[in-house]
Amino acid sequence: MTASVNDLRSHPQIKQRRAIVETPVPGKTHRHPRMEAKRERIVNAAMQHFAEHGYHAARIEDLSAQLDVAKGSIFQYFGSKGGLFVEAYKKAVRSFPTYLDSPSQIRERGFFEILRYWLLRTERLVREDWIPYRVALLGNYGVDLSLKREINRFLLAEDPYGSAAFVRLGIARGEVRSDIDSTLIVSILDWTMERFQDALLTEELDPGLFPHPADPQKNQMRINQFLLVLKGAIGV
């Protein structure tokens, strides 16, 4: 018997994880709707500002002038430029689809075909909305170590890509190894997919950061090779 997607998404561990993530933060609960709207407007503008200028070149003064909002107000909401970037990063990655958001006919083909589906759509997705992908790329490679640690804690706590449920689907279908701790498999999946997708994207967003140009035929070959290597590592 195979587990359904809904069964996997309703798993107690996932519910517990979401409960932890969604626990209100002291001092930040019950914001006035006007204050919440202002905060959201700042984050949205910050996403574009960071995407266009990078993290280090971005200036809170410029963002303040653009929004006609006092610089002190921005710091009151987010504490620092780093705090604002982390919130922009969270909003960016929360906007991405999860693995199990793939079409039902793709999910029926199994774990590695779901991966293939998303890898083939990577460049199309970034062309449709480049700002969150650029912000995510900056969070992965263009920020200080202290911010990177905070980003890693967020990714571990929230699992925005639905990696844990996706790995359980692969194990339940008999496609992913069950003799290895699933948490380790999730980590391997996240690490390798992040780096490989970034390599596919950066020629479009940051030419020269990775050595391979965006060539559709070469990318198709590299996707096939990547899936072959990943299947050899975690596949049955």
What are these regions (language model features)?
Residues 1-26, 121-124, 157-173, 188-236:
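C-terminal peripheral helix-coil segments that are non-catalytic and often amphipathic
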Residues 35, 89, 93, 115, ...:
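Amphipathic, non-transmembrane alpha-helical scaffold segments
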Residues 41, 49-83, 87:
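Helix-turn-helix
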Residues 52-56, 107, 129, 173:
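Short coil/turn segments at alpha/beta junctions that flank glycine-rich nucleotide-binding fingerprints
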Residues 38-47, 63, 88-92, 96, ...:
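Generic hydrophobic, amphipathic alpha-helix propensity
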Residues 123-165, 183-186, 212-215:
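Short secondary-structure transition hinges
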Residues 87, 101-131, 182-189, 219-223:
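Hydrophobic alpha-helical connector segments
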Residues 31, 56-57, 176, 180:
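Short, charged helix-capping/linker segments at alpha-helix termini
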